[in-house]
Amino acid sequence: MSGTIATPRALLSLLVAASLVVAGVAQADDAGIGPQDIKRQALSSAVVEMAYSPTQRALFVSAPDWKEEARSRVLRLDPNTLAVKAEIPLKVKGFGVALDDAGNRLYLTQGFNGEVGVVDTATNHALGSIKLLDKVVLEQAYKQAGISGKRLDFLLAELKKFKITEDYQYRIREIKYDSHTGRLFLPGLGFGVDSVLYVVDTRAGKLEKVIPGFGYNAVGITLDEKGRRVFVSNMQGQLITLNADTLEIAATHEVQADQLLNLVYDPASNRLLGVDQGIDRDGYRNHHLGRDYVKRSSGHRVFALDADSGKVLASELTDEVPIGLLLDYRSQRLYVANRKGVRVEHGAGTLTVFDAKTLKRLQTVDLPPHPNSLALDPHGNALFVTVKNDGAGTKAGKPESVVRIQLQDK
């Protein structure tokens, strides 16, 4: 992350977006989702992001292994029962996912290896990876980038603290697939430098371009495929719009949300919906910017922005530390996964449900310890949530889970 040096486990808070082990079913605060609608399945030592394939009628889940990397895999689940139908071995850890369903390809960010993994969803085989970047000597890279003075001293102290000399200068967290061009778009979180956007040509199987100019900690990304726009948010209150065809930055807007971690685009209303995470990262951000950043939001909120201008159309509180969000276009429901704490011993995370048009909160569902990412099966009208361990669950070696929620017709 930009201006931040940390251990791989600490960086996972951004890479997984970047995600239960407690017995029992989730409880709903009001009518809507009830205990009878919820099924939970413990699966692996770690689960991160998911993609539902209508073609395969399967749910694909990234399952990295922190203790033994070669045990990392993609799980293929039955979307009705959550039974594991196939395990697809990976050589390295995979995190964020993007699906090319027509081409039977699943792409995974391999954030600690500088690559994008490729999986054949029809045959359940890994097809290798696409290289994005090499390791560099970070001190040399900082000096070559013109970093000096207090900012350089701060970064070098962080390198010394964590005993880092060589590393990847950018971390890859999220990934989006453009079906019109076959391109992948991947924000690269700058490791002490401004972030970039990686563009991969999947038809050629190679990196096409690296685009600079994405500021401190570029994290959120979504596409307007019909309008040919890519939207990227960062952790300094900016929304950057890229032309999806020319790959030129069309606009950079200052917005009234400091940490838009994840975004979705609503084509029906030309709005961007995003979660403002609310985690304290003032020190790192101020060092990176060389000034005191003035906060614009209380955090822990859901925002609706005009996609053309970045103007706030609506904003409502959600629960603490929102991570993933998903828009059900048919029902106009917005689902938000809230961690309710970072690195806590006992997690009490929730799923909040909003009316997507007004952002009125409709329901809160307990999904402890830490709900993370979301996927939707529109055919079966089912919502899926990955739920990650808290401190106690990790120490006990409990597996992380996927939850299936049967949604009701609106």
Regions found by a protein language model. Give the residues of each.
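Predominantly soluble domains enriched in secretory-pathway, periplasmic, or organellar proteins
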Residues: 5, 21-410
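Bacterial N-terminal signal peptides that target proteins for export
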Residues: 2-14
